[in-house]
Amino acid sequence: MNTPKELRYSKEHEWVRVEGDKVRIGITDFAQSELGDIVFVELPEVGTEITANEPFGSVESVKTVSELYAPISGTIVEVNESLNDNPEYVNESPYEKAWMIVIEPKDLSEVDNLLTAEQYAAMVNEG
């Protein structure tokens, strides 16, 4: 399982990368491996307000549909449109090509409440 150390993680298996005053969000390698082959990604539009721990979109795999949960609150400023035509990026490159959204956070310090890579790996391994 790939768990980059520089990212923060939610208990719902989303990752967060702080990029200046913005935050990029996607799903973890563990999540994509559990879901199986991703066939569709549904994401909100730019300008949508998201709230921490609330659903903001979904991913559909050959096995199931899973909601995406916002790890922190903010306003969406960018959506990864390439996932419309290439949902397989979620399986192939969950931390690079398959980021889901970029937000302008309401409070960047919310990131501090998320799990470190070590904490996330421990949670997943306890399963």
From Swiss-Prot:
<dbReference type="Pfam" id="PF01597">
    <property type="entry name" value="GCV_H"/>
</dbReference>
<dbReference type="InterPro" id="IPR017453">
    <property type="entry name" value="GCV_H_sub"/>
</dbReference>
<feature type="domain" description="Lipoyl-binding">
    <location>
        <begin position="22"/>
        <end position="104"/>
    </location>
</feature>
<dbReference type="GO" id="GO:0005960">
    <property type="term" value="C:glycine cleavage complex"/>
</dbReference>
<protein>
    <recommendedName>
        <fullName>Glycine cleavage system H protein</fullName>
    </recommendedName>
</protein>
<comment type="function">
    <text>The glycine cleavage system catalyzes the degradation of glycine. The H protein shuttles the methylamine group of glycine from the P protein to the T protein.</text>
</comment>
<keyword id="KW-0450">Lipoyl</keyword>
<comment type="subunit">
    <text>The glycine cleavage system is composed of four proteins: P, T, L and H.</text>
</comment>
<dbReference type="InterPro" id="IPR011053">
    <property type="entry name" value="Single_hybrid_motif"/>
</dbReference>
<dbReference type="InterPro" id="IPR000089">
    <property type="entry name" value="Biotin_lipoyl"/>
</dbReference>
<dbReference type="InterPro" id="IPR002930">
    <property type="entry name" value="GCV_H"/>
</dbReference>
<feature type="modified residue" description="N6-lipoyllysine">
    <location>
        <position position="63"/>
    </location>
</feature>
<dbReference type="InterPro" id="IPR033753">
    <property type="entry name" value="GCV_H/Fam206"/>
</dbReference>
<comment type="similarity">
    <text>Belongs to the GcvH family.</text>
</comment>
<comment type="function">
    <text>Is also involved in protein lipoylation via its role as an octanoyl/lipoyl carrier protein intermediate.</text>
</comment>
<dbReference type="GO" id="GO:0019464">
    <property type="term" value="P:glycine decarboxylation via glycine cleavage system"/>
</dbReference>
<dbReference type="GO" id="GO:0005829">
    <property type="term" value="C:cytosol"/>
</dbReference>
<dbReference type="InterPro" id="IPR003016">
    <property type="entry name" value="2-oxoA_DH_lipoyl-BS"/>
</dbReference>
